[in-house]
Swiss-Prot record:
PANTHER family: BIFUNCTIONAL 3-DEHYDROQUINATE DEHYDRATASE_SHIKIMATE DEHYDROGENASE, CHLOROPLASTIC, SHIKIMATE DEHYDROGENASE. It comes from Streptococcus gordonii (strain Challis / ATCC 35105 / BCRC 15272 / CH1 / DL1 / V288). Pathway: Metabolic intermediate biosynthesis; chorismate biosynthesis; chorismate from D-erythrose 4-phosphate and phosphoenolpyruvate: step 4/7. NADP(+) binds at residues 83, 129-133, 227, 250. Homodimer. This is Shikimate dehydrogenase (NADP(+)). Belongs to the shikimate dehydrogenase family. Coiled coil: none annotated.
């Protein structure tokens, strides 16, 4: 990597973010594509978010990725939203186009690209969690023609999600069922009617926690996914695998959302398969 007077800067903005693998992905992509840029991780407090976003313009950065907990809040500070970000109501990529900050959402595209040989059109989806990344997956599923969407979260969080999910449902013209994960009968019923079941809660990152009971029974033929990539197999995925189901972790989503963000910021195609091999080696997956 060379650093000179022409080097451009990009970053990921979030809190916490020191654990992020995004700098590894983007800096490797810059090296492989001979792009004179460097990608850093910025851990930003909420009261400094507006200034951090304005710095993208001030320092003529290529752009920035936005992670939790700022995917909705960042919208206030942008000049324009792409259609997917507008429909979903969350942004994970900001691109500096001639001093105009444009927000995109590549999370949903990245997730569904990671599901090889699976297409959501006409199928049913059940998802645990309703945060920014979950919203992106739900929104992309509706754009891609999903038949039925059931979202489960803790009962005391439902009121906080109601307005945002309602707005997304209205914008996309598709109903969303928002239910309490404590209602095990409703959860079991929804999963039994589903083709895809996703854990988007973050539970399982510790290698121990489960978002569902340990005696939960999955229906045959269900595809089970977890947005977590470390550990490579969460307890949620292990439970599904032990019942003979196909499982997918979050590594592909991480890579392919970055691929689209890289393309938006640089205009170049990311050498994704080479980077994927390096990621697997780095994470010892």
């Amino acid at each position: 990597m060379k650093i000179d007077g022409h080097t451009r800067l990009a970053a990921v903005i979030a809190k916490p973010i020191k654990h992020s693998i995004s700098p590894f992905i983007h800096n490797m992509a810059y090296d492989l594509t001979d792009t004179n840029a460097v990608y850093l991780a910025f851990e930003v407090d909420r009261e400094n978010l507006e200034q951090a976003v304005e710095n993208i313009r001030l320092h003529q950065m290529l752009g920035a990725n936005i992670s939790m907990p700022y995917k909705q809040e960042v919208i206030t500070y942008l000049d324009e939203l792409d259609e997917s970000a507008l429909l979903i109501g969350a942004v994970n990529t900001v691109v500096n186009q001639n001093d105009r900050l444009i927000g995109y959402n590549t999370d949903g595209l990245g997730f569904f690209r990671s599901l090889s040989n699976f297409h959501i059109k006409g199928k049913n989806l059940t998802i645990l969690g309703a945060g920014g990344a979950a919203s992106a997956i739900i929104g992309q599923a509706m754009l891609d023609g999903v038949e039925k969407v059931c979202v489960f979260d803790l009962r005391d969080r439902l009121a906080g999600h109601q307005e945002r999910m309602g707005q997304m449902s209205q914008r996309l013209g598709h109903p969303i069922q928002l239910l309490a994960v404590e209602d095990l009968a409703a959860l079991s019923d929804a999963v039994n009617q589903s083709d895809l079941f996703i854990n988007a809660t973050g539970l399982g990152m510790d290698g121990k926690s489960l978002p569902i009971p340990s005696d939960f029974t999955f229906p045959k033929g269900l595809l089970v996914a977890d947005m977590t990539y470390c550990p490579a197999e969460t307890p949620f995925l292990r439970l599904a695998r032990e019942q003979g189901l196909q499982t997918v972790n979050g590594l592909g989503m991480l890579l392919y959302q970055a691929e689209k963000a890289f393309e938006l910021m640089t205009g170049k195609k990311m050498p994704s398969e080479e980077i994927k091999k390096a990621l697997i080696e780095k994470l010892e997956i």
